[in-house]
Curated annotation (Swiss-Prot):
Gene responsible for this protein: xylA
Record's protein name: Xylose isomerase
Co-factor(s): Mg(2+)
GO biological process: D-xylose metabolic process; glyoxylate metabolic process
GO molecular function, one term: magnesium ion binding
Catalysed reactions, semicolon-separated: alpha-D-xylose = alpha-D-xylulofuranose
Length: 445
């Protein structure tokens, strides 16, 4: 990586550049499993994993929750307004360099404050965007994706593209227009649409079909404008079932895929899937990844984990090796994520308030996914599950099963077969055996 842009302040004083020291290292500021240059399956770990740091949780979050005030100690937070925005850029690129992180991601309002008018807001964005572009040029760090924050400001109380207020729809369009221009200017490899407040609380005051139609209209406008300005990055949509609204329109992978297909958007969008959102939807993360993968719509990942005992978006750093292994299994089976990556949409706990906790947390997440990648690659290489699945469905490779697959069977022929074939014998699914094998691979690979 090229030498970084200089900064007058050392924001992460006790942390040097994080390097790989191996699994026997006791240094908390070293990678134990993530060796960026290690080659697995013909690609380096850095190429496989495409790690990205989320600007919002890392540099703007202050630890405020519904029960208490801010707790985070950040060397840059005594600044205000645009000065604060500039200091955050310096801190961000210092951290990217220390972690050798190849990508980052942001909402528009993460990097620059809103002004008193849309024009002033865009001027603020332009100023910080110029600074970021300079740092990107000097560091080699790239923008994985950007998006528009259309949920914080009170104007979006009823939603953005699904708002009942046409003035809000227009403002949201202007904001995404600027976001797409930002994406092109900074070379974003993707542009994300997250539902924010695109949903509803009660059907008593909601025209559901009208709102879905408007959401689709909005996205088609975005597709058209991207073509107009020559932005060729991948469009991504991020499912979430609830929070902040009771019923989010992009509930889960299946619902979102149905929406994209219904409105003719599936050739323009892929899915950005978040582990914690899968938990909120009552799914495993690997279920969501598989659902997107089999439809050819797996685009990128927000890497985090939810707390199984809590019913809200906790956005914890991913440390569950079962989850990272099964996630990487799906990603490898997908042939990778293309222009997507693993973006750490995760925040340190409110009680982990020192700057170095940000470094520890990202090391933990990067190591967890590196370990998951290695185990998943070995599982695929050894055909541990593939052979089991192939054997399990073998009845469809011959006889009546093959007739079904080839379209030669119908209800009449199948009824005749069932009448003549009096004995049905099922075989065990061996679920416990397979879980034991998975344990063995996680522990020994």
């Amino acid at each position: 990586m090229a030498q970084s842009h200089s900064s007058s302040i050392n924001y992460f004083g006790s942390a040097n550049k994080v390097v790989y020291e191996g699994k026997d290292s006791t240094n908390p500021l070293a990678f134990k499993y993530y060796n960026p240059q290690e080659v697995i399956g013909g690609k380096t770990l850095k190429e496989h994993l495409r790690f990205s740091i989320a600007y919002w949780h890392t540099f703007t979050a202050d630890g405020t929750d519904v029960f208490g005030a801010a707790t985070m100690q950040r060397p840059w937070d005594h600044y205000k307004g645009m000065d604060l925005a500039k200091m955050r850029v310096e801190a961000a690129f210092e951290m990217f360099e220390k972690l050798d992180a190849p990508f980052f991601a942001f909402h528009d309002r993460d990097i620059a404050p809103e002004g008193s008018t849309l024009k002033e807001t865009n001027q603020n964005l332009d100023m910080i965007m110029g600074m970021i572009k300079d740092y990107m040029r000097n560091s080699g760090v790239k923008l994985l994706w950007n998006t528009a924050n259309m949920f914080t400001n009170p104007r979006f109380v009823h939603g953005a593209a699904t708002s009942c207020n046409a003035d809000v729809f227009a403002y949201a369009a202007a904001q995404v227009k600027k976001g797409l221009e930002t994406a092109k200017e900074l070379g974003a490899e993707n542009y994300v649409f997250w539902g924010g407040r695109e949903g509803y609380e009660t059907l008593l005051n909601t025209d559901l079909k009208f709102e879905l139609d408007n959401l689709a209209r909005f996205m088609h406008m975005a597709v058209d404008y991207a073509k107009e300005i020559g932005y060729t990055g991948q469009f991504l949509i991020e499912p979430k079932p609830k929070e902040p609204t009771t019923h989010q329109y992009d509930t889960d992978a299946a619902t979102t895929i149905a929406f994209l297909k219904q409105y003719g958007l599936d050739n323009h969008f892929k899915l950005n899937l978040e582990a914690n959102h899968a938990t909120l939807a009552g799914h495993t993360f690997e279920h969501e990844l598989r659902m997107a993968r089999v439809h050819g719509l797996l685009g990128s990942v927000d890497a985090n984990q939810g707390h199984p005992l809590l019913g809200w978006d906790t956005d914890e750093f991913p440390t569950d090796l079962y989850s990272t292994t099964l996630a990487m299994y799906e990603i490898l089976q997908n042939g990778g994520l293309g222009s997507g990556g693993l973006n750490f949409d995760a925040k340190v706990r409110r009680s982990s308030f020192e700057p170095d906790d940000l470094i520890y947390a990202h090391i933990a997440g990067m190591d967890a996914f590196a370990r998951g990648l290695k185990v998943a690659h070995k599982l695929i290489e050894d055909r541990v599950f593939e052979d089991v699945i192939q054997h399990r469905y073998r009845s469809f490779t011959e006889g009546i099963g093959l007739e079904i697959i080839e379209g030669r069977a119908n209800f009449h022929t199948l009824e005749q077969y069932a009448l003549n074939h009096k004995s049905i014998k099922n075989e065990s699914g061996r679920q416990e055996k397979l879980k034991a094998i998975l344990n063995q691979y996680i522990l020994e690979v």
